Amino acid sequence: WGKPTVVYGGGLSNDQIQSTRDLFDIEDTNNVYETSVDANDLYNYLGIAGGDTSSLISSVMVQKQDAGKGVKVKIITEDNITKITSNQYANAAITAGVSDVEIDVASVSKVTGESALTGVYKALEANGETLDLDRTQVAQDELETTNEIAENNADNSNFDSGRLDQAMVEIKQELAEIKKNQGSAATAEQVEQVVTDALKKFNLSDIISQDDIDKLIEFAKKYQNTSAIDSQEVLEQLN
C-alpha cells in the first residue's frame, strides 16, 4: 500500500472522473493509484449477475492505516449517497474481512451507494490482499438488509438507523461468543434469541415489524456460517 487507491464507478465519463478527483482533493494523479469497477466486479465480489457498468457511479478512495485503527468511513457527498450510512459501510466492510482502512465515498450524482463496497474490495485486491467471497457476499446481504429495514421505517419517527447499526454489531459479537463457548455455531433458537435481545437492548423490538426481525434472523444465520464468526480481527474492528 504505497499510495491511496481510488476506484471509480465504471459508469463515469472522463469529465465526471475529473469531478470525482476534485471531490477527493486529488491534485496530482501520480500520488494515487487509480482503477475502476465494472459489471464483472459486481458479479465477482457480490454475486450480482446481469449488472450494468453504466449504472456504477459511486467511487471510493481507500487508504491503509496502522494496525488497530479500525475501519473508518467518510461519505464526502452525503446528499448524493441516498441510502447507505457510513456506519453501515464500515460494518459490512468488516464482515467482508476489511481491516484498518480509511474509506472515502463520493458520487457526482444521486445514487443508492450500494455498489461502493465493490470498489473497496477491488482496492484491497489491487494491493495484494485476498478476500473470502462468501464473506463479501454476506456483507452485501448485510448492507441490503439494514438498508431495507431503514427504508421500511423511513416514516417512523421512533426508528433510528444508528441504533440498528449498534444492534448489528451486538448480534455479531454475541454469535461469535456463542460459537467460542460451545464450539459450534448457534442453533436456530439461539440466533432468534440473540437478535431479540439485541433489538431489545437498543429499543427497537417494538418499533420494527416482525418481517424486519425475520430479515435480521436470516442474515444472522448466514453470517455465522462464514469465517467472519471465527475472526479475532473482526471482533477487534467491531469494538
Model feature map: region roles:
Residues 218-239:
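A cross-kingdom marker for long, charged
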Residues 1-104, 126-127:
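N-terminal, leucine/charged-rich tether regions that mediate assembly and partner docking
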Residues 88, 94-207, 211, 218:
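Soluble oligomerization/assembly scaffold segments of membrane-associated complexes
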